């Protein structure tokens, strides 16, 4: 058989064209240092900031420092199996967490992995932990109230859907209790809640989860926990993982309440990472970009425009102060980023005023826009009355000769303080808050002994539930007060038949 050279040439060319290489090209580096949740690797010249990197044992890290001769990597999870000389490769991806309805009711770590022993989470949707915040034109003014169920907040420092309201105070002043009560009050409000525990004891997180489960709040809540025993990178990433889960709901037109408990511990974890990565320290040894650490997180909370679905993320970040010093570095940073702050004072807490909210230092920059009309009408002057009472109370310690008007202000002030007290885990619906504040501001409590105020309040609610439920219904549906004469008559009828005369 004759062999044709042209045929052989064509056959070889075809085989070359059809050749499929069966190997992957990946950029790899070698670990030169490992310790304290930090690795350094040489050879990853094209790595991007924030890129996910995979170690040879299956662990993941995130590129943080891109230097001329190596890359500084924070390790996400356990680093005990990583050794110097191990291979680390680029993935070309940034860190993502699982999101979606399947996450609700679960307790997860900052990587989105379940830690509640209830099995795997059935979801395929993911979102990057770092995404840009909505722009100016993508936002909408905050106008819908977020009812916390706490009279002292809903009346004095109202919070709206899409607002960022800082909760600041010393340790053991009831910060977490305020947030848990706000979550409990969202039952039936078509609200999804996310509780991010940063650097808390695992026993404390367990207690909070059991509280949420006991009151049925876990049915609409996701808990993200990075406990004190976990490496610093997980504490640093936890709030971003939480807000990524929240954004999935917000961009689908839903409303989310997210609690960061607390950002002081995140800042400390970030300081630790930055110093280990040899970044230059600044004030209080924090790195220069610690403001950006919190601003890029909190700016992702917003009320988005109708074109984007009209959803919202409301953020309640916590900051722990030392001896009530709200002028500290991290505290002033977060105060300047947020739309107001609720300041909890240790001396008020210890004197039995709980929630221990200092009305003078607390403010909401959204204000009346986030209140229903009925609450605006009954709570309009409450803050000023309380401030003048505190001033008079301090003044009267120097003398006892008081005119009748001053005495009346002091009496009203004492009753105001009592009315604003509230038992733990007993949030009140807004219509009940409106009725008791109306009774207070219209003088119905002036002749009730201060020690009987809480009993009066409970009895008033029971009486209205039994005889005047239509008034509660009017406030609920119209968001406004019923006829004043009708409300006056109902409260007077209760006083006439009770022992509080």
Curated annotation (Swiss-Prot):
What catalytic activity is recorded? Answer: ATP + H2O + 4 H(+)(in) = ADP + phosphate + 5 H(+)(out)
Q: What is its main location?
A: membrane
For this UniProt record, give its keywords in alphabetical order, as a comma-separated list.
ATP synthesis, ATP-binding, Cell membrane, CF(1), Hydrogen ion transport, Ion transport, Membrane, Nucleotide-binding, Translocase, Transport
Read off the Gene3D superfamilies from this record.
2.40.30.20, ATP synthase alpha/beta chain, C-terminal domain (1.20.150.20), P-loop containing nucleotide triphosphate hydrolases (3.40.50.300)
GO MF terms here are: ADP binding; ATP binding; proton-transporting ATP synthase activity, rotational mechanism
Q: Which chain positions carry the site (Required for activity)?
A: 362
- Recorded E.C. number(s)? 7.1.2.2
Root EC class: translocase
The organism's superkingdom is given as Bacteria
| Similarity section | Belongs to the ATPase alpha/beta chains family.
Oligomeric state and interaction partners are given as: F-type ATPases have 2 components, CF(1) - the catalytic core - and CF(0) - the membrane proton channel. CF(1) has five subunits: alpha(3), beta(3), gamma(1), delta(1), epsilon(1). CF(0) has three main subunits: a(1), b(2) and c(9-12). The alpha and beta chains form an alternating ring which encloses part of the gamma chain. CF(1) is attached to CF(0) by a central stalk formed by the gamma and epsilon chains, while a peripheral stalk is formed by the delta and b chains.
Protein name, per record = ATP synthase subunit alpha
Q: Which organism is it from?
A: Streptococcus agalactiae serotype V (strain ATCC BAA-611 / 2603 V/R)
Q: Which gene encodes it?
A: atpA
């Amino acid at each position: 058989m004759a062999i044709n050279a042209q045929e052989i040439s064509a056959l070889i060319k075809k085989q070359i064209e059809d050749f499929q290489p069966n190997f992957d090209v990946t950029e790899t580096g070698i670990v030169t240092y490992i310790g304290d949740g930090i690795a350094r690797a040489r050879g990853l010249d094209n790595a991007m900031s924030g890129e996910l990197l995979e170690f040879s044992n299956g662990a993941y890290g995130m590129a943080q420092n891109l230097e001329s001769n190596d890359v500084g990597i924070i390790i996400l999870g356990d680093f005990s199996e990583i050794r110097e000389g191990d291979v680390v490769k680029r993935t070309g991806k940034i860190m993502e967490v699982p999101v979606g309805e399947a996450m609700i009711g679960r307790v997860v770590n900052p990587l989105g992995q379940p830690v509640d022993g209830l099995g795997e989470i059935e979801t395929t949707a993911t979102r990057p932990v770092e995404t840009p915040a909505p722009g100016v034109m993508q936002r909408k003014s905050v106008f819908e109230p977020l009812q916390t169920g706490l009279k002292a907040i809903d009346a004095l420092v109202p919070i709206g859907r899409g607002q960022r309201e800082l909760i600041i105070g010393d340790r053991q002043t009831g910060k977490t209790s305020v947030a848990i009560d706000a979550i409990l009050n969202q039952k039936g409000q078509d609200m999804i809640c996310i509780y991010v525990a940063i650097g808390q004891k695992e026993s404390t997180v367990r207690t909070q989860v059991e509280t949420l489960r006991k009151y049925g709040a876990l049915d609409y809540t996701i808990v993200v926990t990075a406990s004190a025993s976990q490496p610093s990178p997980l504490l640093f990433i936890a709030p971003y993982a939480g807000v990524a889960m929240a954004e999935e709901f917000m961009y689908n037109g839903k409303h989310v309440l997210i609690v960061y408990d607390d950002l002081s511990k995140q800042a400390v974890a970030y300081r630790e990472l930055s110093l280990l990565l040899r970044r230059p320290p600044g004030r209080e040894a924090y790195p220069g970009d610690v403001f950006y650490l919190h601003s890029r997180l909190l700016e992702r909370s917003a009320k988005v425009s109708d074109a984007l679905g009209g959803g919202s993320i409301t953020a309640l970040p916590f900051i722990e102060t030392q001896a009530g010093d709200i002028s500290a570095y991290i505290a002033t940073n977060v105060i300047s980023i947020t739309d107001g702050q609720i300041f909890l004072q240790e001396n008020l807490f210890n004197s039995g005023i709980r929630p221990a909210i200092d009305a003078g230092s607390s403010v909401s920059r959204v204000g009346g826009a986030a209140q229903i009309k009925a609450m605006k009408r009954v709570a309009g002057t409450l803050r000023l009355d309380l401030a003048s009472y505190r001033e008079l109370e301090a003044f009267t310690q120097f003398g006892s000769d008081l005119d009748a008007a001053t005495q009346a202000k002091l009496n009203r002030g004492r009753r105001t303080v009592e009315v604003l007290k509230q038992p733990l885990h007993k949030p009140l619906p807004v219509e009940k808050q409106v009725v008791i504040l109306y009774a207070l501001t219209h003088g119905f409590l002036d002749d009730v002994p201060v020690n009987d105020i809480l009993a009066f309040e409970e009895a008033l609610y029971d009486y209205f539930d039994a005889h005047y439920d239509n008034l509660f219904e009017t406030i609920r549906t119209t968001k406004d007060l019923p006829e004043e004469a009708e409300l006056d008559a109902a409260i007077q009828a209760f006083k006439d038949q009770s022992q509080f005369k």
